[in-house]
Amino acid sequence: MPHSEKPVDQERIVERVQRHGDSIWALIEAQGMATRAPFPDPRTLRSFSLGEVAEILGVSGSYLRQLSIDGLGPTPELGTAGRRSYTLGQINELRDYLASSRPKEALKFCPRRRQGDKLQIISVVAGPASTTTSFYLAQGLALQGFRVLAIDLDSHGSLSGMFGYYSFGYPVHNASMYAAIRYDDDQKSIRSVIQPTLFDGLHLVPGSAELSIFEEDCGRLFRSENFKYPDASSRMVSALKEVDADYDVVVLSCGDGGFLTAGAYEAATGVLVTVRPEMPDIVSMTSSLYSFTHFVALIERAGRTVNHDFFKYLVTRHDPRDVSQQKSIAMLREPLGDDLLTATVWESDAIRQAGDKGRSLYELSSGSVGRSSYEQAMKSLNSANAEIMDIMSEVWGRAPFYVSQASRSTTAGKASSESRGLSK
């Protein structure tokens, strides 16, 4: 069929689309957004009830209430009927107060690195719910008092979007990890791209389309050097050394970039692989394992040793009522043994609904997504995070206690005493 003929002076489709894009971008620039991209969605973090704070800190609500009455520690906000609530910043102030007033339990209240403890760098391999896992792990660690840096290595900025940072797919200049690892004269310190988040003690290096430029640069070097492995991953290691003293944990959320993923593997002290207990996902996960061994072989061929303190697997999107999934988990347990975490993260409408609201469950109260679903999801999330924190504790030579604490509590987002009208 011949193309329809149009008058010479009629605007072509491609020209109209170009005009649309230019016009909309001009409006965005006029509002001052384009110059700040990736820019955060303006939102605030809710306060936490006294019952929630008691669970997070592992103390009783009556003890916290008495501290408030005695004027000790931060002053909580008083709401309806005198109910007390604390910001996350105030929770961390409470940590410092409790650590100083109860020195024998200082590590419980203030679990940050001590002298001689190495920075924990956890690489979360791209897979089922891996971005969500990175998101909840980073926020969960921050709620427990750790200083956390989350790094989005996805050129689509998936993790960044969860934190409220949006780049619209544009390769914004030096706004991602690319700034710290690029090969040209525009290389900057990683500090220049670290952004705040809603969570006190949790920072983010956003992802951006410019990360794909790094992949292209590495590919050209790889080919031009007769397939000798370039120093792409050692650049990641060097960049993180700049902020070694500033954080306790770094969470590297991997995307689909090969060289960036290799960098995450070399920099990591531990690796976390997510897997959904369905056969196609298990096959895909197995491919990721072969990719890991391939990347490590290339790095070691370049004369650098790759060592990890742990390599763990986490079952995500688990439906415990699905018999076939239970069989798949049992099948995985045989070859993986203790490397497969005991906790699983359940398939959850609450997590999906929170995502639809552009929030995490930690940012919402139970009434926002349904109390029963909320509490169930929080229990599975907190159980998985507790296992990972116990692994970190063992690496630092500490006795693990997070799993036992999680088993005694309800959820970090649920205050059972408050629901009975007791927490004020």
Tell where the protein language model's regions lie, with residue ranges:
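Beta-strand-loop-alpha "switch" segments that mediate conformational coupling across diverse proteins
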Residues: 208, 317-324, 328-364
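Inter-motif core of Ras-like GTPase G domains
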Residues: 261-279
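Long, basic/Gly/Ser/Thr-rich N-terminal segments
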Residues: 1-109, 422-424
